[in-house]
Amino acid sequence: MGELGAILRIQVQREPLKAPHGWYDPSRIVAVDEAELTSLGLVGIRGGERIVDAHHADHPRSRGGGRRALSVGFRGHYEAMAARFGERVRLGIAGENLVVDGPAVRMEDLTGGLVVVTADGVEVELRAPRPAAPCREFTTFLLGGREPRPRDELVDELEFLSGGTRGFIVSVGHLTAPVVLRVGDVVRVG
């Protein structure tokens, strides 16, 4: 597949999107101009403010303890979600950290991982991609609800969002030095 596209959006979750209330709250997603990526996760930078992502190992309410340090979504998946769920689907609403201006991809397209090529020419490997499992809270939100619906009422929607449509979680534990990512950096298959 080669080049997939440029990073359209970088964002962090200031706080977990489901806790403490139990429903999906996208107001905690913050778009940033750039972000520092380390083996522990992502720290967004906006107007000089450093915002630690909720999945970063050092966040006080860390989601995943650093095991889900970075996630990536694609414009093509957002187009598919918007066609199915309508106007509630805005770019970045699924909460992934990087949104790439590229087509919908399948897991088999990403077996070699992803590489971000920064404007400075630095290549950053994003290893071992795996589909982000869709949750009841996000799926209920897309359907216009607040309190999560029972799983048996969401079977078709959860199936639609699985396999990468909801985004991919990648490994960054191998990184040995911080790297700054910016909107416009190019993403390609590894």
Predicted segments — roles?
Residues M1-G190:
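Metal-cofactor-dependent catalytic cores
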